[in-house]
């Protein structure tokens, strides 16, 4: 899949008030960064998601990969910074599992979020690159808008979409693998059922 092409399409459809969050690894983060710059997508922050419980390197030929890069970008450029950012929520955010984030202090660009998923997140199956729900929840805490729109172009098992539904957003996702489409559908149906039962 052509990274430049899908980023170009995201730039075309995202609103000035919106932003784009891209998960990357050491294999492709540099290339994604360059594509963003060539397209005029300004990088707001580069976040290092630190995974304390990352898998060990079994080959003994390199360091253990214990972080992933998340790029936060927008299309307005330096002169049109209209993207939404809930600064107060970023300061107030607190999680006992994050040993780096202090309550009522500015959120930093290193996030300490364990990579383990709950049983509820895995009960319908999993995806090889599935992220914990807590990662998406933190992102939406910073820039999600209730009743706003969330597009997930690589939906996988639906984690980001589940987070969006829990946040009260209108979600749309794309996925080409039928196995993961089925998992995502079950997770979304389960999430909607839980939300509906709260108001009965």
What are these regions (language model features)?
Residues 188-200:
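Positively charged, low-complexity nucleic-acid-binding target-recognition regions
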Residues 1-174, 179-181:
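Core catalytic lobe of class I
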Residues 184-185:
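Conserved SAM-binding loop
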């Amino acid at each position: 899949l052509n990274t430049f092409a899908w980023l170009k399409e995201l730039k075309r459809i995202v609103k000035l008030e919106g932003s784009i969050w891209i998960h990357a690894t050491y294999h492709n983060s540099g290339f994604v960064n360059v594509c963003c710059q060539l397209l005029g997508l300004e990088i707001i922050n580069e976040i290092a998601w630190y995974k304390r419980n990352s898998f060990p390197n079994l080959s003994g030929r390199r360091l253990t990969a214990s972080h992933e890069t998340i790029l936060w970008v927008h299309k307005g450029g330096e002169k049109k910074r209209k993207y939404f950012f809930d600064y107060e929520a970023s300061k107030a955010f607190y999680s006992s599992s994050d040993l780096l984030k202090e309550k009522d202090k500015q959120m930093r660009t290193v996030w300490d979020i364990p990579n383990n998923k709950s049983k509820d997140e895995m009960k319908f199956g999993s995806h090889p690159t599935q992220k914990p729900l807590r990662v998406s929840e933190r992102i939406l805490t910073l820039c999600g808008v209730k009743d706003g729109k969330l597009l997930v172009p690589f939906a996988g098992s639906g984690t980001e979409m589940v987070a969006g539904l829990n946040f009260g957003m209108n979600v749309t996702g794309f996925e080409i693998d039928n196995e993961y489409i089925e998992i995502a559908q079950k997770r979304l149906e389960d999430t909607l059922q839980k939300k509906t039962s709260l108001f009965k």
